[in-house]
Amino acid sequence: MSILEKIQEKQPLILNLANFVTPQRVADAISFAGGSPLMTAEISESETLVEIADAVVVNIGTISEKDYPLFLTICQLANQKHKPLILDPVAVNVPFRANFVKRLMQEVKFDIIRGNSAEIAWFADKESLNKGIDALESNLEVEHARVAAQKTGAVIIQTGKVDVISNGFEELFVETDSPLFKINVGCGDMLSAIVGTFAAVSDDLFKAAYEATEFFGESGVKATEQVENLPGNFVNRFLDKIYQATQEVI
């Protein structure tokens, strides 16, 4: 049974600490893929929600210092309860965010980290230019992904024109990029959510990370072909393609 088939059978619950820019898109991505999205911003319900969740996805896109106790508690509980823990380290090389993530990593282990080349370079202690959340570098930086995986112990998904998935010893590549991913804010957040959904039903997180990234990219390419040069129509068509793929395996 494929991972996508397992998602349709289990309908995993994905707990998200989402940013306040793209929560609807994140929830839609999980739901259209066959999972069940759940968001929280309340620390008092952390244990209950992590207990019932099948995976946890945390996104630092709009963090403030007051969020740290919630993030720490949720992440620690995910580790304690052996729930896959996925980090989306938005603009992590900005000092406040870097400090926030460093503090978290002293206390918890992330199972999968999904970011662009500049964000992944930070985990590898390498230099990489960035602009906001979009990496300027276009070269494939396989070494950064591998070193980041070795340093963090996480499976790394480095997204770009060619996506690199590394466990520190082996790399897999996905070459299904769409220019409309970059234009539509939140596509990276959606990918992290899809990764969490795949990880929730798989014992092999490296395989889950690869298959989620491939599934996401293929759906994006198909959607791009249909919207032509109308990027405002992309996300809706993209979600349609995700849903159609799930129906083909039922």
UniProtKB/Swiss-Prot annotation:
Annotated binding of ATP, by residue:
114, 159
Q: What is its EC number?
A: 2.7.1.50
> What is this enzyme's class at the first EC digit?
transferase
Q: Enumerate the Pfam families for this protein.
A: HK
- What InterPro entries is this protein classified in? Hyethyz_kinase, Ribokinase-like
Superkingdom, according to UniProt? Bacteria
What keywords would UniProt list here?
ATP-binding, Kinase, Magnesium, Metal-binding, Nucleotide-binding, Thiamine biosynthesis, Transferase
Q: At which positions is substrate bound?
A: 39, 186
Give one GO biological process term. thiamine biosynthetic process
Cofactor(s) the protein requires to work: Mg(2+)
Q: Which GO terms describe its molecular function?
A: ATP binding; hydroxyethylthiazole kinase activity; magnesium ion binding
* Reaction(s) this enzyme catalyzes, per UniProt: 5-(2-hydroxyethyl)-4-methylthiazole + ATP = 4-methyl-5-(2-phosphooxyethyl)-thiazole + ADP + H(+)
Q: Which family does it belong to?
A: Belongs to the Thz kinase family.
Q: What is this protein called?
A: Hydroxyethylthiazole kinase
Which species is the source of this protein?
Answer: Lactococcus lactis subsp. lactis (strain IL1403)
